[in-house]
């Protein structure tokens, strides 16, 4: 396809118009008095949201050059969302401010590469200053609640639920968000290790009212192959039957003669027994069986390791305080594994999480980690309508990610104050030349933008409040919700340091690319050729 080539000011101005179009749509959502954005869809009802990245993702501009600018800032929002889970609006506002200030200087003759070097130096200094400002959250339930409430757009109910979930499962635990059947929003915590495999036969059920299998202090046999014949199982079944304890078999599958004999023995009351398929597939199944073995103090019976069912002894079986199984899930509570061995396994999984590049693998490793170290909490989000449900679920997701970020890297004063305080660190920063010094000044002015936007969304003059907050020190800032100047940390207005850091780094990265752009290539849309050839007339004599 033919390309239209734009150079210099024409290229950069087009990109800036796109940046402004997207940023202006996104920034109306910032702060406690930020407004909603309603997004029309070509099918279904409209979506109402206050989530910056949801707004950014929907924006496509008609002009191809402007659209390139918008897409670059969209990248800021989505990358910030991927890395920190929140702060997408802050990142967009910062990117717009850096681009605006930077292009003014480029138009006045500054060298774009020197400006970019100055911007990068300033960002590095601010990030170091944020690290000094950060305070550790640990397991402080109040701080977790405050962060979650702010990220959920000042919804204290959501904040409280997330704090409850964190208190129950700890920072290693997994918290997932699901849609509730009714209008109530609540937390459901699963104790112990749960995996998504139910009983292989309903005849194993011990509680007909709940249709569940409940086994107290059972032995647990872990086998990585299929069990089809009863003969294989007899060396295990006989000593277990003599002990009088129940038995749970977790294997690749149990079928044929083996399954039917187990069911008959269960119904006759000769054995308390149940069988489930092993969770996962392939290598992940082997790893999860090993996790269960470590948790329960058992051994995986695997021919790869030289073990067979025929030579399995009762000492090789795992133990747990309780096991409950329904048609979809198996939950093992209080496994008898040794704490040190479990801890080593947890550290091994953490190491794998750090080295893997796949988001999917990372998610699965996090789930395994939670099942071993913490637990699993499900946050059920309820609402009166589908539109409200989607909007609320977005906010809960944001709050959850922000809380994780806070636990990971600590917290700083919210409401744009932490960035404003970091300006002081730029005063001593040395530049190699005048344009680099200008780049540092660009960042110094741009980091006022989040506070300015929060104030303007609250209906006040941004410059006045920014000047007043700048006069103060420490955590002194402006509470837009109550229209007061307060100590931000004491008032519970806090941001995760990771969110602030990632927002600034991503904004500076994309802004630098726009400032150093000298040429833009755009597809030229081909004019539609006329319609096809007209239909010929019919043959003579035809109607």
From Swiss-Prot:
The catalytic activity, as recorded, is: ATP + H2O + a folded polypeptide = ADP + phosphate + an unfolded polypeptide
The protein's location, in the record's own words, is:
Cytoplasm
Q: Which GO terms describe its molecular function?
A: ATP binding; ATP-dependent protein folding chaperone; isomerase activity; unfolded protein binding
State whether keyword Protease applies. no
A biological process (GO) of this protein is: protein refolding
Q: Which GO terms describe its cellular component?
A: cytoplasm
Indicate the enzyme's highest-level EC class. Answer: isomerase
Q: What is its EC number?
A: 5.6.1.7
Secretion signal span: none
Which residues does ATP bind?
A: 29-32, 50, 86-90, 415, 495
Q: Which Pfam families is this protein grouped with? A: Cpn60_TCP1 (PF00118)
Q: What is its main location?
A: cytoplasm
This protein's UniProt keywords:
ATP-binding, Chaperone, Cytoplasm, Isomerase, Nucleotide-binding
The record's family statement is: Belongs to the chaperonin (HSP60) family.
Q: Summarize the subunit comment.
A: Forms a cylinder of 14 subunits composed of two heptameric rings stacked back-to-back. Interacts with the co-chaperonin GroES.
- Matches recorded under NCBIfam families: GroEL, PRK00013.1, PRK12849.1, PRK12850.1, PRK12851.1
Its function, per the record, reads:
Together with its co-chaperonin GroES, plays an essential role in assisting protein folding. The GroEL-GroES system forms a nano-cage that allows encapsulation of the non-native substrate proteins and provides a physical environment optimized to promote and accelerate protein folding.
What name appears for this protein in its UniProt entry? Chaperonin GroEL
């Amino acid at each position: 396809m033919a390309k239209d080539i734009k150079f210099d000011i024409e290229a950069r101005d087009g990109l800036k118009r796109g940046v402004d179009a997207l940023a202006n749509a996104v920034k109306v959502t910032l702060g406690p008095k930020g407004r909603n954005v309603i997004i029309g869809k070509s099918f279904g009802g409209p979506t109402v949201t206050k989530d910056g990245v949801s707004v950014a993702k929907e924006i496509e501009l008609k002009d191809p050059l402007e659209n390139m600018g918008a897409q670059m800032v969209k990248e800021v929002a989505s990358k910030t969302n991927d890395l920190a889970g929140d702060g997408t609006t802050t990142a967009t506002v910062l990117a717009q401010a850096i681009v605006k200030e930077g292009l003014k200087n480029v138009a006045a003759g500054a060298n774009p590469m020197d400006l970019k070097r100055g911007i990068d130096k300033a960002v590095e200094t601010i990030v170091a200053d944020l690290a000094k400002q950060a305070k550790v959250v640990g397991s402080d339930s109040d701080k977790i609640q405050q962060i979650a409430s702010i990220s959920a757009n000042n919804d204290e109910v959501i904040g409280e639920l997330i704090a409850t979930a964190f208190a129950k499962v700890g920072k290693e635990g997994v918290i997932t968000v699901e849609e509730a059947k009714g209008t109530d929003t609540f937390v459901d915590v699963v104790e112990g290790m749960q995996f998504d495999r139910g009983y292989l036969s309903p005849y194993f059920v011990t509680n007909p009212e709940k249709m569940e299998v409940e086994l107290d202090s059972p032995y647990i046999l872990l086998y990585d192959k299929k069990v089809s014949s009863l003969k294989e199982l007899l060396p295990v079944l006989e000593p277990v039957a003599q002990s009088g304890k129940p038995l749970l078999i977790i294997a690749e599958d149990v079928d044929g003669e083996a399954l039917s004999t187990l069911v008959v023995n269960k119904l006759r009351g000769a054995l308390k027994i149940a069988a489930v398929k092993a969770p996962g597939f392939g290598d992940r199944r082997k790893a999860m069986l090993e996790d269960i073995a470590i948790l329960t103090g058992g051994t995986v019976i695997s021919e790869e390791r030289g073990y067979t069912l025929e030579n399995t002894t009762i000492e090789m079986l795992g133990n747990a305080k309780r096991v409950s199984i329904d048609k979809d899930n198996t939950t093992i509570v209080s496994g008898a594994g040794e704490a040190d061995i479990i801890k080593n396994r947890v550290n091994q999984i953490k190491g794998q999480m750090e080295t893997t590049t796949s988001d999917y693998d990372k998610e699965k490793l996090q789930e395994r980690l939670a099942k071993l170290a913490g637990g699993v909490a499900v946050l059920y989000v309820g609402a009166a309508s589908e539109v409200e449900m989607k909007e609320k679920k977005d906010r809960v997701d944001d709050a959850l990610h922000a809380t994780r970020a806070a636990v990971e890297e600590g917290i700083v004063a919210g409401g744009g104050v932490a960035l404003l305080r970091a300006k002081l660190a730029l005063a001593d920063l040395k530049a190699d030349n005048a344009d680099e010094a200008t780049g540092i000044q660009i960042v110094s002015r741009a980091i006022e933008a989040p506070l300015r936007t929060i104030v303007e969304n609250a209906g006040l003059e941004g410059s006045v409040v920014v000047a007043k907050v700048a006069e103060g020190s420490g955590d002194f800032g402006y509470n837009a919700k109550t229209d007061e100047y307060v100590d931000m940390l004491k008032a519970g207005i806090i941001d995760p340091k990771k969110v602030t850091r990632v927002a600034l780094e991503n904004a500076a990265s994309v802004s630098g690319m726009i400032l150093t752009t000298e040429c833009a290539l755009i597809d030229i849309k081909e004019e539609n050729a006329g319609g096809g050839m007209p239909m010929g007339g019919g043959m003579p004599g035809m109607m």
